[in-house]
């Protein structure tokens, strides 16, 4: 979406956002670990609401509550329903690659939504330790598969890299010249680059620190360094590879129009065939998005716990699981 709506120059601003985001993520993770506390179950809990309360003082707890309200609501949409929609969308694209005449999208989406909800429920109701055990296995696997696939496309089209980087740096400041007039505003390029950068690495949102606060690491500075690496890996590596794959592959990018996940599948298909590209994207995106769903479930649960106490965690998780089905069956757009 960022590349098609903002042009190649969005990658430049994505990198700028990542550099700023590394410092932001470092700060918020450090504060989360420094000002965390134990809940009634003996688990570490932390995040913006806790370093507001424990760092600024209890008179500022109201600000932490406001943060929690918005974060818990965002978890249901951005961290849950949108991700479920991405999963079913990528799988539907893969199904069409193998069976172009397939017409049961609504039924497929409902079935996939129910399956995802059941899988999420099994993990979530197993507690924080099971959540960590699942995500620590999913993330490396999905990253390796996706990185290798993108690198293969980029190396296969290495001769186009000079032109691609020219378009990225020129398009960052004069988008009209590299998008055929489809994207004429530099502000639009900056906007899409920064929005997608923040959406991918969560730097400054205050959400990721809640996960970091659960660590057994006692030194805040050491844990905060992982926050820097997160932004680097997620945005500088993963997002950059996605953008370069699209730009190097030679596929037709309709600038100024919202792009679909099928574009990445099409780009990978230039080397791995259409079926192979669709399959890689379906698997990689399913793992990416599902781990995101699990992570945001923790964020929302922690926010409800801060406001209402531990008794609110389970009801929120039930609503969260049901929202997965909604996201899979209703057409939502970020």
Segments from the language model and where they lie:
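Membrane-interface loop-to-helix entry segments
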Residues: 84-91, 107-169, 304-305, 334
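Transmembrane helix-boundary motif of multi-pass solute transporters/channels
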Residues: 1-17, 208, 215, 222-223, ...
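Select transmembrane alpha-helical segments in multipass membrane proteins
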Residues: 12-13, 58-74, 112-115, 145, ...
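A generic transmembrane alpha-helix motif of multi-pass inner-membrane proteins
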Residues: 311-334
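Flexible loop linkers connecting adjacent transmembrane helices
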Residues: 1-10, 23-58, 252-272, 298-307
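Helix-loop-helix module between adjacent transmembrane segments
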Residues: 20-42, 48-49, 53-85, 92-123, ...
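Extracellular/periplasmic helix-exit of transmembrane alpha-helices
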Residues: 28-35, 40, 150-167, 178-181, ...
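Hydrophobic, small-residue-rich membrane helices and short re-entrant helix-turn-helix hairpins
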Residues: 48, 123-140, 160-165, 196, ...
């Amino acid at each position: 979406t960022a590349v098609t709506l903002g042009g190649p120059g969005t990658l430049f601003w994505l990198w700028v956002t990542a550099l700023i985001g590394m410092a932001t993520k470092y700060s918020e993770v450090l504060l989360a670990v420094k000002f965390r506390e134990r809940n009634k179950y003996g688990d570490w809990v932390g995040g913006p609401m806790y370093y507001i309360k424990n760092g600024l003082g209890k008179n500022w707890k109201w600000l932490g509550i406001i943060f929690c309200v918005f974060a818990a609501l965002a978890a249901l949409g951005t961290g849950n329903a949108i991700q479920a929609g991405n999963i079913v969308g990528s799988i539907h694209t893969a199904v069409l690659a193998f069976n172009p005449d397939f017409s049961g999208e609504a039924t497929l989406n409902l079935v996939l939504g129910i399956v995802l909800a059941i899988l999420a429920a099994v993990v979530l109701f197993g507690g924080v330790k099971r959540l960590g055990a699942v995500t620590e296995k999913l993330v490396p696997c999905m990253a390796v598969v996706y990185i290798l696939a993108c690198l293969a496309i980029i190396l296969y089209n290495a001769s186009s890299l000079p032109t691609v980087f020219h378009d990225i740096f020129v398009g960052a400041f004069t988008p009209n010249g590299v998008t055929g007039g489809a994207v004429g505003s530099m502000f639009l390029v900056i906007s899409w680059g920064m929005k997608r950068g923040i959406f991918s690495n969560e730097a400054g949102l205050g959400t990721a620190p809640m996960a970091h606060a659960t660590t057994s690491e006692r030194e805040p500075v050491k844990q905060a360094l992982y926050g820097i690496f997160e932004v680097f890996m997620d945005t500088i590596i993963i997002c950059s590879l996605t953008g370069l794959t699209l730009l190097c592959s030679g596929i037709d990018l309709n600038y100024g129009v919202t792009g679909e996940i099928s574009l990445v599948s099409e780009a990978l298909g230039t080397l791995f065939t259409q079926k192979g590209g669709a399959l890689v994207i379906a698997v990689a995106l399913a793992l990416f998005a599902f781990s995101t769903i699990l992570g945001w479930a923790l964020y929302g649960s922690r926010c409800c716990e801060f406001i209402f106490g531990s008794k609110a965690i389970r009801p929120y998780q039930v609503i969260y699981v049901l929202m997965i089905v909604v996201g899979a069956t209703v057409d939502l757009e970020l």
